């Protein structure tokens, strides 16, 4: 996908295998915002990390234990959370599913 392209057709874009039962697909983005789909197999881990981007995560399907700055929440389909810049966060998948992550500004480190 090219930056500022208006339509992202999911079926035309491959997944990036991150290992450990996690794969990612960068969807629509420009310099200000990026949408990323992340698929988790049962018991897969979203490694604890931090970054300077603002992040909002939406649970499209599945159930996750999601930790932000030392507080752990159980999130399921339809739930969302806000991750402030530089907050330490990560997750554990307790029912296979998909997270939709929205970042501002875009994550240049996710581009090929």
Each predicted region: which residue ranges?
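Short strand-coil-strand connectors
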Residues: 67-71, 94
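Short, conserved beta-strand element in jelly-roll/cupin
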Residues: 39-41, 50-66
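Conserved short histidine dyad/triad with adjacent acidic residue
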Residues: 19, 34-50
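A short, N-terminal "cap"/entry segment at the start of jelly-roll beta-barrel domains
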Residues: 1-32, 112
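Short acidic-glycine-tyrosine-enriched beta hairpin
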Residues: 70-85
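Histidine-centered metal-chelating micro-motifs
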Residues: 45-46, 65, 81, 85-90
